[in-house]
């Protein structure tokens, strides 16, 4: 594979914005077709911000139409584009209106799922590195969050895109969602962020305790991927150091027995079978359904993790078709599925 030369990026940007950037689709999306229910001057009141060469940051950009947007982007050749809210006035005229009159009125609800937040449940990569093994985490997260947004909240218009570097974004674009208050947005985020944990978790996971319906439905999705991902690709029960982290979370009544069985086993899959048998034993004792998938997924935050979710209207998130200049790569986002 040919090595990328960062000094070529400015010329590549010019080529990209002149020949490849999907201006028509971009404008149609952010103008929502200009149909019924879309306020007058909707696109003109949308804020854009550009990051240029040498990290020069320009806010409060706005455009009359697709043609103006196209001309300015080909003139500026931004390294990064952020999309903001739709305001009461044109953002490029925000200094000309009365103090306090310039207010955000609409904004999509956007979730940013970052692979680095899963470093405690992947062993193949870390930081911004991604491979086919750990990308399974993104697949699980997408299916979990998308199911909840669709079935639990009834949101219809959801755009999943690759962030261009180390994760995915979900843009929820329903008209009703774009007008949600900060309090309601925070409530949605809280609902989807029930599980907290990681390597610092000390609380034992009681496999028989009642589980929130969102987590239960998430576990059902995880089951389709768990053994292949956790036991084969990540080999989470490979050695004593690894399995001790798991056993620290199980009830004391089965801890010693599992420790002995784990030492006699030769693979993560074999140790997993012992863990499932222990869960079944707990179920018979307590007469309450148990599921080891639920315990491990909850403890290690496999269900869902989101970062940079702005519950307000004033924040901006990276555009769906951009160059990430600092890593010198094309970040043409594409729909995941």
What residue ranges belong to the model's regions?
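Low-complexity, glycine/alanine/valine/leucine- and proline-rich hydrophobic stretches
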Residues: 332-337
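A residue-level signal for conserved active-site and pocket-lining positions in enzyme catalytic cores
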Residues: 111, 170, 319
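A short beta-strand motif that forms the metal-chelation/ATP-contact edge
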Residues: 168-175
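Short, conserved alpha-helical segments within structured domains
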Residues: 162-168, 315
């Amino acid at each position: 594979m040919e090595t990328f030369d960062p000094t070529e990026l400015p010329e590549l940007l010019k080529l990209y914005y002149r020949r490849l950037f999907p201006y028509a689709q971009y404008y149609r999306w952010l103008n929502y077709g200009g149909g019924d229910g879309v306020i007058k001057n909707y696109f003109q009141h949308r804020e854009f911000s550009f990051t240029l060469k040498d990290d020069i940051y320009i806010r409060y950009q706005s455009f009359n139409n697709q043609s103006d947007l196209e001309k300015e982007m080909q003139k500026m050749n931004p390294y990064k584009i952020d999309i903001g809210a739709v305001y009461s006035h044109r953002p490029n005229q925000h200094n000309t209106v009365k103090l306090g009159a310039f207010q955000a009125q609409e904004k999509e609800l956007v979730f940013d799922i970052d692979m680095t937040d899963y470093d405690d449940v992947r062993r193949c990569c870390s930081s911004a590195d991604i491979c086919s093994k750990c990308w399974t985490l993104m697949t699980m997260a997408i299916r979990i969050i998308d199911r909840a947004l669709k079935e639990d909240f009834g949101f219809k218009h959801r755009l999943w895109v690759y962030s261009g570097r180390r994760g995915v974004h979900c843009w929820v674009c329903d008209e009703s969602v774009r007008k949600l208050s900060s309090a309601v947005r925070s409530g949605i985020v809280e609902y989807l962020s029930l599980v907290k944990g990681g390597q610092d978790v000390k609380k034992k996971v009681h496999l028989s305790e009642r589980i929130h319906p969102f987590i239960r439905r998430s576990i059902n999705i995880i089951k389709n991927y768990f053994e292949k991902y956790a036991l084969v690709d990540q080999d989470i029960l490979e050695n004593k150091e690894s399995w001790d982290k798991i056993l620290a979370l199980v009830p004391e009544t089965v801890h010693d027995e599992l420790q002995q069985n784990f030492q006699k086993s030769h693979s993560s899959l074999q140790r997993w079978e012992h863990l499932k048998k222990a869960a079944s034993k707990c179920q018979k004792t307590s007469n309450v359904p148990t599921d080891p998938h639920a315990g491990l997924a909850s403890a290690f935050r496999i269900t869902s993790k989101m970062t940079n979710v702005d519950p307000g209207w004033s924040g901006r998130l990276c555009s769906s078709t951009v160059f990430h200049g600092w890593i010198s790569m094309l970040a043409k986002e594409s729909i995941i599925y």
